[in-house]
Amino acid sequence: MSVAKYPDIFDELKSEVRAAGLLDRIPVRGSIEMIAIIISMILVYVVVFNWENIAPPAFGAVALGLFMTIIFTRAVFVSHDVLHTQYFKNKSLSFKLSYPFAAIIISNSSSWWDFKHNINHHTWCNVPEKDEDILAMDGAFAPKYKGNKAWLRSYKYLIFWGAMFFMYPAFIIQSYNFAIKRKKYGELALMLMHWPIVWGPVFYFLPFSDAITVYLVLNFVLSPWLAFGFITNHLGCEVFEKDESEDLTWMELQMRTSRSLSGGAFIHWFYGGLNTQIEHHLFPKAPRFNLLKIKKMTQDFAKKHNMKYFETTPLEAYVQINDVIKKY
């Protein structure tokens, strides 16, 4: 029996969005954001090299850690966007441009992310056979794949929500494993350069206690910032078997497996555009800066054709996710 419910009219919406110019690449604006990140990193070096002269107050290391966290989050979002070719149409160029942000600033593999995210996740969203993200927490979010581990049930809330504080190191480990297994040695070398380039000066010029403070603040703020953004995208949404997903159109699969969040410009900045998840999945190459406009068009289109558009507040999304965990 077919699970399809939506009419096959994605081309109509796509034509409207394209006519509005919202699918056009943004090389200038994208370049400005990339340059801003590099300038911000230079500012970090200036502060680090002059740490003793600046004589920062007691909270100086915390402030530096928070500032670097903002830089790192922007680097994550920029590398995500550029690998989707939102800035430049040329895939090879986009890959090369991602390296300073993905490999050097955050020590992540662009090749791993492209395979895991762009190829598997976007093509087979919430299809457990292909999209490993939906198998989180022992398959708690994919009913047919849900495990039954007694120890996990006992500590499920602590494990799931506690894991949010370790997403960044988990990404690094997965990136290194992928690069080594796939023999991406050039990329691995760039990823390893992260440590002497980013952290070498911090630990050389700062007192050890300050350097450790910067490192810990960044890791324990960056991880939940990213994690609490990522989990709202698809966890708690519909899940399909591979054969079921093949009966759905592109539009129906992406809309039924994704959740967008309400909110304006600040929410859009804070979540790096991931709050417009439905729109990002329908139009992965559409620039992040255009997604709020595309969201309005998509909502109007869904209402016109009586299609469900799944949107919640950020808090509602976390409650829905917690409700699923409760059933594990």
Feature-to-residue mapping (PLM):
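Short, charged cytosolic
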Residues: 1-16, 157-168
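N-terminal signal-anchor/initial transmembrane insertion module
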Residues: 5-8, 12-20, 24-28, 33
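Residue-level signal for inorganic ion chemistry
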Residues: 16, 234, 280
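Membrane-interfacial helix termini and the short, flexible loops that connect transmembrane helices
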Residues: 18, 22-25, 51-54, 78-91
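Alpha-helical bilayer-embedded segments of polytopic membrane proteins, i.e.
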Residues: 25-75, 102-106, 156-171, 182-230
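Juxtamembrane transmembrane-helix termini
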Residues: 53-54, 177, 236, 240
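Membrane-embedded catalytic scaffold of the fatty acid hydroxylase/desaturase
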Residues: 67-183, 246-328
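Transmembrane alpha-helix/helix-exit interface in multi-pass inner-membrane proteins
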Residues: 226-243
